[in-house]
Amino acid sequence: WDKQTGAWLIPATNKCKAELDQLTYYVRHFEPVQWGTVAQSQTEEDVAFQIPEMPELDGDHGLKVQPYPYQLQGIARGLQLKRFINGDDMGLGKTLESIATINKADAFPCLVICPNVVKINWQREWHKFTDKKAMVLTDSVRDSWPFFWQTGMNQVFIVNYESLRKYFVRRITKAEKWTLKDVEFHNTIKLFKSVIIDESHKVKSTATQQTKFCKGIASGKEYII
């Protein structure tokens, strides 16, 4: 920092020039930077964003209970988007909206991936809201669960994050530092038409096993919530 000139001095190297060119690019292409003291600074005008109105659901919602009007709109929007994050606040009924969206779309079989402690709750909610039968995957049906879909006994299958490898992964071809392309899944994952990923913050890191498994299983599915 040069006190006399009031400027920063940097070495005249190619590396510094490249970084300076990049900085100049951002300054030119984004909002102009206004320099001055706090007293001299001007308040930028507020930017107003127009949020589109939510659609209304056409036809019967297909549930055993009557959803709230905002939930019906959420279901309608989910049917439009097909792949989306349900960002409703806690307690507003995200589970109902997700179940209703899959049920209305008839996107079965459906796989629900969730924390271990809420598997039974998801099963109860499916039975409470719809006439579909939900199964929690256990060791007793590790290899036979597709039979329950093929015979019409179950339409929904529920699994916790930690068990994805057990039920859906045939093998991983590398011992260390493996990526999704090194994972061989069982062909049974192709059966699913939809996937619900509950508590999806658990798959925010692309470096974790469960994120890679979720991505591989959900890839190509018409409905992903």
Language-model segments: residues:
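Accessory DNA-engaging acidic/polar modules
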Residues: W1-G62
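SF2 helicase/translocase NTPase motor core
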Residues: E44-R77, R83-N86, L92-Q210, S219-K221
